[in-house]
Amino acid sequence: MAMTWNDLQQNALGLTTSPALLLVDMINGFTDPACALGTDCPEVVAANLQLLKTFRALGLPVFFTTVVYRNDQQAQVFRQKVPALNVLQSDSHWVKVDSALEPLDGEPVIEKQWASAFFDTDLDQQLSALGVDSLVVTGLTTSGCVRASAVDALQNNYQVVVAEEAVGDRNPEAHRANLFDLNAKYADVLPVAQVLSQLTALCGDKG
């Protein structure tokens, strides 16, 4: 018998008492539909802001990612496959975090060239140094960098929660299919309200 969404929830691991928030590519190039890579997603931005405020209030670590290309040699094949990525140059407006989610001093912005926040970056080392052992993953896009980052987080032995309303995709079908896959094998896909409830229960005394 095929697994249902409810079946998958039976295997939820949840968060630990040492979580961090990873906002994947919540940058102008993806949140602004004027960019070829972008989509109109104010509800995703709002959900990210809600989580961001809670993590900050609880004194928990926050990490952002962006995609930046500093020379023509970086990620050549990826950029040939997706030429729209070429707008993500180091001096471009498109690589900056959406102003609604402006990082604070001390909140790292991880530069990456590929889909995963972990591939060829020092994210794992930074998380390990802080004693982080679970991640709330949000951002854009569900079928691309969010999925790749969530899978790599698991493969680096983090418990992973994907905040359902805080991720988005240009293609609704791809969004739904990838959330199902993530929930089946790599992460807990939970509503933002449930994530906030877990955070308060586990870490409320840290704020």
Which residues does each PLM region occupy?
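Short acidic-hydrophobic, aromatic-tinged amphipathic segments that line or gate anion-handling sites
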Residues: 110, 188-195
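Short glycine/serine/threonine-rich phosphate/pyrophosphate-binding segments
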Residues: 142-149
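Active-site-proximal loop->helix
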Residues: 170-183
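Active-site acidic carboxylates
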Residues: 1-104, 108, 199-207
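A short glycine-rich beta-strand->turn/loop micro-motif centered on a GG-aromatic cluster
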Residues: 136-139, 158-172
